[in-house]
A protein has these predicted regions:
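Active-site-proximal helix/loop segments of hydrolytic enzymes
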Residues: 1-162
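Long, low-complexity, intrinsically disordered segments
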Residues: 157, 161, 166-175
Length: 175
């Protein structure tokens, strides 16, 4: 968030910055990723799952006033933006997305993001997106073949929670 869009308030003698103008999630992908198509497909699925749970994406990354923080919206249906400079997105050999689950400079959204309920909503959306992605690609997240031809395949995303935070999701083949 550019400094010119932030406002200040003092709380217990400490200066804080905020901007209540924008709220919502954002999903980022890189055109330089080795599996750009897979990244876009997963980003689309993730955005759709978040929207099914009544979350909305933030459009502010497309505004000129964002300056160097401005990003091209590549999937307006799902809230997926292009972010080529981010190493973790562009240098991986597998599909990759970055999920910004909300805007913590928005005071109300920061409070919502801190609740176990909101974390669970986001974790459930990520889980469903991983399940859909694995099922549609016929492979595990690691890129291995899913099973022997002719066998019925079922996929399940496993999710573990520790202190209310979702840990990495693993796509597992179930026979």
């Amino acid at each position: 968030m550019p400094d010119n869009l932030k406002e200040t308030w003092e709380d217990q003698g400490k200066k804080n910055y905020y901007s209540d103008r924008f709220s919502g999630y954002a999903i980022f992908v890189s055109n330089d990723n080795a599996d750009r198509t897979g990244s876009l497909a997963f980003g689309h699925s993730l955005g759709q799952e978040l929207q099914k749970r009544s979350l909305h994406y933030t459009p502010h990354y497309t505004f000129a006033l964002m300056g160097r923080y401005r990003h091209e919206l590549v999937d307006a249906d799902a809230g997926v933006y292009r972010y080529d400079q981010l190493i973790v997105l562009r240098r991986t050999l597998m599909p990759a997305v970055l999920l910004e689950a909300g805007s913590i400079v928005n005071r109300q959204e920061e409070l919502e993001l801190a609740t176990p309920e909101r974390r669970l909503i986001v974790a459930d959306a990520v889980t469903a997106a991983v399940e859909n992605f694995c099922a549609n690609r016929g492979q595990t997240v690691a890129g291995r073949s899913a099973s022997k031809p002719g066998k019925r395949r079922k996929y399940r995303a496993l999710q573990r929670h520790q202190a209310g935070v979702a840990l990495p999701l693993i796509c597992e083949l179930r026979r």
